[in-house]
Amino acid sequence: GINPKPQSQGALDSVRIRAKYMDQLGVNSFVVIDFSENFSRITACGFIKLLLELTTPEAIVVGEDFKFGNPSDAASALDLQDLFLKEGRDVEVDIVEQILTEGGEKISSTLLRRLIKNGELKYFFELSGQSFQIDLMPIPYRFDDGKLVFSTDAIHQLLPPLGAYDTDLILSD
């Protein structure tokens, strides 16, 4: 996964939650790349070389609109196979077609962020197949008069608007 750009409006989940999803899907190698200014300058070939330094992929799954590399040397999902072969690696590339809502809107992280911002968590679940989760494991908290109290300033995920939500609280992994 790629952590969002610093100027973004928050992550959909934490790296810990994302790693848990990947494990449930049977993914045995998971690389988190911090989308920094230095990273944004990497060429498409440099990106492939970096992936091969960090892991030995047998297969990679990307969306059909996946792009990588700096704008002056960018590549798309269709270029992945050839770029891996240039590095001497035969990596299976699975390109997933875009999935649209019933209204024809592309299901994307942008759409999912909008649903969270609008508090539309049931629709978020319908589209993503996952309940919206807030990772409180690294957040200091206390119980005060039977209520869980923590600072939302310490949460780096995108949060829904203030309000009352039907939730499950899980205090361990």
Task: State what each model feature region is.
Residues 37-38, 45-173:
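Active-site cores that bind ATP or allylic diphosphates and position pyrophosphate for catalysis
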Residues 1-53:
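Core alpha/beta nucleotide-donor-binding catalytic domains of modification enzymes
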